[in-house]
Amino acid sequence: MRDYLDEARRYYCNIVGKYGTQVQALLKKAATVEIERICPLHGFVWRRGIGDFLEKYQKWSTYTPEETGVMIAYASVYGNTANAAELLAVRLRERGVKTVMFDVSVTPASEIIAAAFRWSHL
């Protein structure tokens, strides 16, 4: 699953993410049956690691961050905001805080949205 986790997260967060309550209801129903495979309309068919996959859906559907850290998304026309964002990231890292940065002018929005689900602070 590890190889496909980033894409699974990106799909969930961008397509299914706003339906957390409905996903929770479905996960409750799914817990009462034996699942041999998951066949989504888009993406991979899951035959192995189904428990891990369902755990991720549980986490994502309750909007629980996967990691503690800060995601910094910025746009910078003249470079000043990029410099400020980098300075913020450096200061946070000096304090032991994990950080990830995204330049919104070059990073696909779907990746930024997925990261917003993954990290505890924006």
Predicted regions and their residues:
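Metallo-beta-lactamase
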Residues: 1-40, 44-48
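N-terminal beta1-alpha1-beta2 submodule of the flavodoxin-like/Rossmannoid cofactor-binding fold
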Residues: 46-122
